Design a protein with these regions (language model features):
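Solvent-exposed alpha-helices and their adjacent loops that cap or buttress functional pockets
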Residues: 38, 81-86, 122-123, 148-150, ...
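Short, Lys/Arg-enriched N-terminal segments with co-localized hydrophobic residues
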Residues: 13-26
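N-terminal ligand-binding/catalytic initiation module
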Residues: 24-181, 407-414
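Glycine-rich phosphate/diphosphate-binding loop of Rossmann-like nucleotide-binding domains
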Residues: 100, 105-125, 187, 191-284, ...
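General beta-strand structural signal in soluble alpha/beta enzymes
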Residues: 131, 157-160, 181-184, 215, ...
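Adenosine-phosphate binding glycine-rich loop
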Residues: 184-185, 308-416
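Rossmann-like adenosine-cofactor binding region
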Residues: 258-328, 334-335
Length: 416
């Protein structure tokens, strides 16, 4: 195998002794990752962009010269986007209540994930990012804290905040701030799922308006996927939670679930997930491990599309789904074909929003991201095992950024 120095630099292995690298190759990914984290002692760092080697350098970068930039911003706060790095800075903000499949592990324990996200922002979007882990579960306190710091940022990425609090936090911040705010667990997952579905439907020759879609999981991701697909033209959607099919009029539902209950399950089907799956064309799982049986897949329509996205263990093993007759399968894991991962979304999405000088990220920009991702797989390349570009395909991130920028300009969300 050719040794890729650039790849080693990206993941930090150039800091590790060759003997340690060899030892890592015998471990599983969790062991490898833990060992690497011990060696790295952090995945991001801050570096200066200007020289400070002489008295003149110091006088220009800092005192006394810097005061002139301060006065310019004092007279016009918008100039903070021109005279500082604010314009290109996007924090990854969490309270640590819904981290990966680990749940409520606390803000400090979520820090490795947030650092990793910051690495991806820089690597694929050239966006300066850092973690902000808030030690509070109080919705109002979190909103207030973020608003107090917002003058330092060009955008905000919310991450791993539990449902339903995440809905109010994002909605309020979008209403009260004039920079892009994006909850990736909701919309990033929805965007990449739609991209995968756009290309999968080409292969099975079906229209989104004609198919029956079942979503298992009524948290942040499931509800966002549901609303996003409905907006894109889906007509027949059923969403399930742990108790079964969500139906309008159920008083036990939270506010967000009640909203989607009015938009879905038009035939008023009652029962469990197995009942919902009968005759379905598409299954999308954002729930928990092993919640789908072989029999459920067998009960689906011909040429079924199955996206079990739960991590690290999917709703059904892809091999089992294939045996049961699933025609196209996509998971959240890199171990299988068709990884449906929101890494394809957020770097390019924010790059496009920032480059357009957008004050928000609207639905049209998110749809543009989905269609941009889908377009990166050519007609000749498209197959049952290749419906999405790889997350590390830099051309895909550039395409997303350009598509989002054009949508922002077209829909008039540019700051005056």
């Amino acid at each position: 195998m050719v040794h890729d120095i650039h790849h080693d630099e990206l993941i930090g292995l150039h800091f590790i002794h060759p003997n340690v690298i060899k030892e890592l190759s015998t471990m599983n990914y969790k062991e490898k990752s833990l060992q690497a984290h011990k060696e790295w002692r952090g995945k991001i760092e801050m570096k200066p962009r200007v020289p400070v080697e002489t008295r003149e350098d110091l006088s220009i970068a800092y005192t006394p010269g810097v005061s002139q930039a301060c006065l310019e911003i004092k007279d016009d706060v918008k100039k903070s986007f021109e005279l500082t790095r604010r314009w290109n800075t996007v924090p990854v903000i969490t309270d640590g209540t819904a981290v990966l499949g680990l749940g409520d592990i606390g803000p400090e324990a979520g820090l490795p994930v947030m650092e990793g996200k910051s690495v991806l922002f820089k690597t694929f979007g050239d966006i300066d990012s850092y973690p902000l882990c808030i030690r509070s579960k109080d919705t109002e306190e979190i909103i207030k804290t973020i608003k107090l710091f917002a003058g330092s940022w060009g955008g905000i990425n919310l991450e791993d905040i539990s449902s339903p609090r995440c809905f109010e936090i994002e909605t309020r911040l979008k209403e009260e701030l004039d920079i892009p705010v994006f909850h990736d667990d909701q919309h990033g997952t929805a965007i990449v799922t739609l991209a995968a579905l756009i290309n999968a439907l080409k292969l099975v020759d079906k229209k989104i308006s004609d198919i029956k879609i079942v979503i298992n999981g009524a948290g942040a991701a499931g509800i966002s996927i549901c609303k996003f697909l409905l907006n894109y033209g889906a007509k027949h959607v059923i969403i399930c939670d742990l108790k079964g099919i969500i139906c309008e009029g159920d008083d036990s539902l939270n506010t967000a679930q009640k909203e989607v209950s009015k938009l879905t399950n038009k035939e008023h089907v009652h029962g469990k997930l197995a009942d919902a799956m009968k005759g379905a064309d598409v299954f999308i799982g954002v729930s928990g491990p092993n919640s789908v049986s072989k029999e459920m897949i067998q009960s689906m329509n011909e040429k079924s599309i199955v996206f079990p996205l739960a991590n690290p263990v999917p709703e059904i093993n892809p091999e089992l789904a294939k045996e049961a007759g699933a025609y196209i399968i996509g998971t959240g894991s890199s171990e299988y074909a068709n990884q449906i991962n929101n890494v394809l979304v957020f770097p390019g999405l924010f790059r496009g929003a920032i480059d357009a000088n957008a004050r928000t990220i609207n639905t049209e920009m998110m749809v543009a991201a989905s269609e941009g991702i889908a377009s990166c797989v050519s007609k000749d390349e498209l197959s049952r095992e290749y419906i999405l570009p790889y997350p590390y395909d830099r051309k895909a991130h550039v395409c997303v950024a350009q598509s989002v920028k054009e949508a922002a300009i077209r829909t008039g969300v540019i700051k005056k």
